């Protein structure tokens, strides 16, 4: 699948995806209402569908994954609480400090392996105000990110997910799963999303990354949780009117763009294996589990980015000597071949 207006090959992120022609047609004819008044049938249908799919009672359609996470954190916590997450977690690194500004919460960071925590690390990280002489914040929420972006697109195994949620409950903590790319995790592990999230009180699911919708995330949880989350969505300015146009795109993505994620994963692995053959690049193959490839470079990353850009290929530098490639529905086998060909010509194997 290509269906992208640009001739450039864009590996910067799976957020660069644009609606396909079929998705646009679905959006154009979607019945809409006023979601603030609760009568947008397409939004209602999406919320119910996603909640059922994830084994939860209710869902809330919001504008972005960051908004879904912010609402979840605020619903689960009160000011002065502490949130446990991995040191690479998106809620800590890339959401503008919302946990502090919007929730009044602090974070306890876990030094996970490739972005993945263990239950024992979670137990050791949770602090409770009670019994501390009021010295500690109150650890009340454990957040897991699956897949882990900065981990390289890595996935939790089911036993670890279950162990973490059990440990959190033992410590008196709620649990939230940041599932921005949870369908990638499901495709890679073969675990159904409802089973994967069974131990988690809330889950955020993004539709504007690998699934290719233009906008939208759904936050799922218990009916009471979603009722409370609805209030925070309003307070955060997230109420919207004829949102069914966007909900229709998300529903189309569920129908047509989930099974194909395995193709993205296969292409990512081809890229990783090809780059590893070149002395310029090093890829930790243990991290290449889904649609991301983080690459360490001998040369400055900004030079790699500029060189590839001159050949019509866009990538992101994520460190002084690190670049990232993300595969999505607009990337074809031909694009992968072009990338590897350009890299082989620009940074060839040194002759002996």
Q: What is each model feature region?
A:
Residues 2-30, 34-298, 302-311, 315-331, ...:
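Conserved PLP-enzyme active-site core in the AAT-like
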């Amino acid at each position: 699948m290509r269906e992208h207006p640009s001739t450039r090959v864009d590996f910067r992120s799976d957020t660069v995806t644009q609606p396909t022609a079929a998705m646009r047609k679905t959006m154009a004819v979607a019945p809409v209402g006023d979601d603030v008044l609760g009568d947008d049938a397409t939004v209602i249908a999406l919320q119910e569908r996603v909640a059922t799919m994830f084994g939860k009672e209710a869902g809330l359609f919001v504008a972005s994954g960051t908004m879904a996470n912010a609402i979840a954190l605020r619903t689960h916590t009160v000011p002065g609480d502490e949130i446990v997450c991995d040191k690479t977690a998106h809620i800590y690194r890339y959401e503008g400090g919302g946990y502090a500004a919007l929730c009044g919460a602090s974070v306890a960071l876990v030094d996970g392996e490739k972005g993945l925590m263990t239950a024992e690390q979670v137990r050791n990280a949770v602090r409770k105000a009670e019994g501390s002489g009021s010295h500690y914040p109150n650890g009340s929420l454990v957040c897991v990110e699956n897949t882990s972006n900065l981990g390289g697109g890595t996935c939790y195994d089911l036993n670890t997910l279950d162990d973490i949620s059990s440990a959190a409950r033992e410590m008196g903590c709620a649990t939230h799963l940041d599932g921005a790319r949870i369908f990638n995790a499901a495709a890679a592990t073969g675990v159904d999303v409802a089973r994967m999230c069974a131990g988690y009180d809330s889950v955020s699911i993004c539709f504007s990354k690998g699934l290719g919708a233009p906008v939208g995330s759904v936050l799922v949880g218990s009916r009471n949780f979603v009722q409370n989350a609805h209030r925070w969505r309003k307070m955060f300015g997230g109420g919207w009117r004829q949102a069914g146009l966007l909900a229709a795109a998300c529903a189309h993505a569920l129908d047509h763009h989930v099974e194909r994620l395995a193709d993205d994963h296969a292409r990512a692995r081809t890229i990783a294996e090809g780059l590893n053959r070149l002395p310029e690049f090093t890829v930790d193959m243990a991290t290449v589990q889904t649609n991301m490839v983080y690459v360490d470079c001998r040369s400055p990353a900004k030079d790699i980015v500029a060189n590839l850009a001159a050949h019509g290929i866009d990538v992101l530098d994520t460190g002084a000597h690190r670049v990232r490639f993300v595969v999505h529905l607009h990337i074809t086998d031909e694009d992968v071949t072009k990338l590897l060909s350009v890299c082989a010509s620009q940074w060839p194997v040194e002759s002996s």
